[in-house]
Regions:
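Thiamine diphosphate
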Residues: 1-149, 177, 242-243, 269, 412-547, 555-559, ...
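Flexible, low-complexity linker and terminal segments
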Residues: 2-21, 25, 146-380, 385-386, ...
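Short acidic, glycine/serine/threonine-rich loops at helix termini
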Residues: 47-50, 74-76, 97-101, 123-130, ...
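A glycine-rich helix N-cap at a beta->alpha junction
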Residues: 58-66, 107-118, 198-202, 469-480, ...
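Short beta-alpha connecting loops at secondary-structure transitions
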Residues: 59-60, 118-123, 139-144, 294, ...
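Conserved thiamine diphosphate
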Residues: 120-169, 175, 203, 208-211, ...
């Protein structure tokens, strides 16, 4: 991440290379947003991280909330007393927040409020690739879709203005390629954030008992009609190219970039309608575009969101126009990312144009290069305490136990040789699915979860286990950070998103407060002690909690190096029989094979000592450890 203090520069017209997420952070400063809330999740994490780093200097408030629903509720409270707010989350986070968002559409806001929802086509870092544009339809909230970092900034500013004009939250739907693309962004003028609001009581609007909800639903539908006018006149809904061959392309978001490149590659000369405000759609503008063309090609990622609505518009405005997309011969896939190649192949198929590139040759060249490259599957880092925890868990539970798992670094425990993880659905699901497994199988069941995810979503499931006396064990892998998304703080870390000290919320006290009778904390590197405690937990009737506590190695190493401590790696002595136990049991990337013999990669070893604990011949010796 670059020096983010550049975001604080009040230099209008300055051009800077920024990630899409950093561009949104800059927009927060330009639009005078006073409160920013988030729960970290790729591909949206850098929005909150960027603001966290500069929040004090920017004189605004930022927090890493316990989960996305809390983040929305905190921001909604601010927006309803007149303070501009923004909440950032990944796409599945909107599932968590949906209960609040759906009713907030009825309540509305008084200060501008933007909800950034970052979709992840191709599931690069997610458990699904849902298309959150449908949340805009479902909630009747306006939705903007940027296609570049510059638009990410500009549309955030526009979203605030639309929000205040309609008195509604506005969804800013990004995708991974927009969030994580770095491009030139032109700065505007900074605005002073307003952190001082005032509650103007309006019980009918703000308290959603049934009688009020019925009335406010009517008001919401009136706002939708007003939003249609905004969409028709939005500068982000525009014909960017006018062709002469009566072929029209309609696209949005990152897919628009592929459509333009593919059309240029084929020399198609098509007209292109770019849609940046995609809920509500500009029906009149689209109808006019349909009438001006004989063939319409809709290029969008994931679901046929635009296509379905445009086909409905065509029935009224241009019933004879030919529309090509995902539902007509499936020219475009309903899964994964698009690419210039995929779009070019579809356009060629539809129009009969010839692609000037032999993609088969590029495939062959790629395959030739790739065959000599080592595989790099995602694995736990060398020295990761989760590896020690998994070794203990698998040694105790063996093949007889069931292992529902959760969202976080520890999901990588499914990989060999650890092979821990039987069912993964969503944040916090492990403890609840464990109860169903336990009751249905009668077998030992150990649910795996991390510390941040525990606070995010596990507590209701744990209460359920206590209430219904479920005999399950919850293994909390506590590495004192939200590691997978970038080491953000959480309620158990003792620091806030503002960098201020905070009360550490104790996982063990929370578990005890929920009524769990068996709660113990272990050091996963003390293998024998940890195994004994886990065995005891499995013999307990009712829910039990074992907290495997050891700091994330990356954070720990950073702190030790900052203090000038030296890491002296382990070494393989001549006692080694090459039994391969360390490799077969742990899969640590610091254990490598050279000439058929186990060696320690000194550039990766962090001297955690786990390999020495499992070696039956005491062949792995400390070179001095962490000094």
């Amino acid at each position: 991440m670059p020096n983010l203090r550049i975001l604080l520069k009040d230099e209008p017209n300055k051009r800077v290379l920024l990630l899409g997420n950093e561009a949104i952070a800059r927009a927060i400063l330009e639009t005078g947003i006073g409160i920013v809330t988030t729960y970290p999740g790729t591909p949206a994490s850098e929005i909150g991280d960027s603001i966290s780093e500069i929040a004090k200097d920017a004189n605004l408030y930022m927090e890493y909330s316990t989960n996305e629903m809390v983040a929305v509720e905190v921001a909604a409270g601010a927006a309803n007393v007149g303070v501009r707010a923004l909440t950032a989350m990944k796409h599945v986070g909107l599932n968590v927040a949906a209960d609040a968002v759906m009713t907030l559409a009825y309540v509305g806001v008084k200060g501008g409020y933007v909800i950034v929802t970052a979709d992840d086509p191709e599931c690069y870092s997610s458990q699904n690739e849902q298309d959150n544009r449908y949340y805009a339809l479902l909630s009747n909230l306006p939705c903007l879709e940027p296609s570049s970092p510059q638009e990410a900034k500009d549309m955030t500013l526009a979203a605030i203005e639309i929000s205040e004009e309609l008195e509604l939250p506005v969804l800013l739907r990004t995708t991974t390629r927009v969030n994580h693309t770095r491009g030139p962004v032109t700065f505007g003028k900074l605005s002073k954030p307003n952190l001082k609001g005032k509650l103007v009581r309006d019980v009918k609007r703000m308290v959603m008992v049934p009688a009020h909800a019925r009335l406010m639903h009517v008001e919401l539908l009136k706002k939708v009609e007003k939003a249609k006018g905004i969409s028709e006149n939005s500068p982000y809904n525009t014909v960017t190219r006018k062709g002469k061959n009566q072929i029209g392309i309609i696209s949005s978001s990152a897919a628009y970039n592929y459509a333009v490149e593919a059309a240029d590659l084929l020399g198609l000369g098509a007209s292109i309608l770019k849609l940046g405000m995609t809920n509500p759609l500009p029906e009149k503008m689209i109808g006019q575009f349909l009438r001006a063309n004989k063939k319409i090609i809709i290029v969008e990622e994931l679901e046929p969101y635009l296509e379905t609505q445009i086909k409905a518009i065509a029935k009224d405005h241009a019933p004879t126009v030919e529309i090509y997309g995902k539902t007509t011969r499936q020219y475009f896939p309903r899964k994964g990312e698009l690419s210039t190649r995929l779009v070019a192949e579809a356009l060629a198929d539809i129009t009969g144009k010839k692609i000037p590139i032999d993609f088969k040759k590029t495939d062959e060249a790629y395959a030739e290069i790739a065959k000599d490259l080592p595989a790099r599957p995602p694995i736990l880092c060398a020295g990761c305490p989760h590896r020690a925890s998994f070794f203990v868990i698998k040694r105790v539970g063996g093949e007889k136990a069931n292992y529902p798992t959760d969202i976080g670094c520890y999901a990588l425990g499914i990989a060999p040789p650890l092979n821990v993880g039987d069912l993964l659905v969503c944040m916090g699901s492990g403890i609840s699915t464990a109860q169903g497994m336990s009751r249905a199988t009668g077998e030992p069941t150990i649910a795996i979860i991390g510390d941040s995810t525990f606070f995010h979503a596990a507590i209701p499931g744990l209460v359920n286990a206590v209430y219904n006396n479920a005999t399950v064990t919850l293994a909390v892998l506590d590495n004192s950070t939200t590691a997978m998304t970038g080491h953000q703080p959480h309620p158990g870390t003792g620091i806030t998103g503002m960098g201020s000290p905070a009360e550490k919320v104790s996982i063990e006290k929370v578990a005890e407060g929920c009524g769990v009778k068996f709660v113990k904390v272990v050091d996963p590197y003390k293998v024998e002690e940890a195994q004994a405690v886990l065995k005891e937990a499995l013999q307990h009737t009712g829910p039990s909690v074992v907290i495997f506590r050891s700091p994330c190695t990356l954070v720990d190493l950073r702190e030790k190096r900052h203090k000038g401590m030296k890491i002296v790696p382990y070494r393989v002595s001549d006692k080694c029989t090459n039994c391969m136990a360390c490799v077969k049991l742990l899969g640590c990337p610091a254990l490598i094979l050279e000439d058929g013999k186990v060696q320690v990669d000194e550039t990766l070893c962090v001297a955690c000592g786990l390999c020495a604990s499992v070696c039956p011949y005491n062949a792995l010796e400390s070179g001095g450890g962490q000094q």
